[in-house]
Amino acid sequence: MSCTASYAGMTTPVKDKEGHGIPCLQPIDVVECTYQYFTKSRNKLSLRVGDLIYVLTKGSNGWWDGVLIRHSANNNNNSLILDRGWFPPSFYTVHSKRTTRGA
């Protein structure tokens, strides 16, 4: 199954950092980052204000597992870049529910 994401009014294929299509995700929430957070840890997300994070699980340790989707630097193909990791839930506001869907 391929997947598309609605982002800023556009529906585009979801791709990983190498440009490969990814399976469809089923987030439990979509949140918007309200504070910057930078980390060097490979299993955590660095966040920018306005980033949308698709929440996959809410960990018992206080951190949430999520997927961050951004437009690629090469906007000619209108693809998205995907990054997954843990993030502090105090850095967001609820944006919407499940805007990712299978194609």
Curated annotation (Swiss-Prot):
InterPro entries: SH3-like_dom_sf (IPR036028), SH3_domain (IPR001452). Keywords: Cell cycle, Cell division, SH3 domain. Pfam families: SH3_1. Gene3D superfamilies: SH3 Domains. One of its GO terms (biological process) is cell division. Residues 26-97 form the SH3 domain. This is Putative truncated guanine nucleotide exchange factor YLL017W. It comes from Saccharomyces cerevisiae (strain ATCC 204508 / S288c) (Baker's yeast).
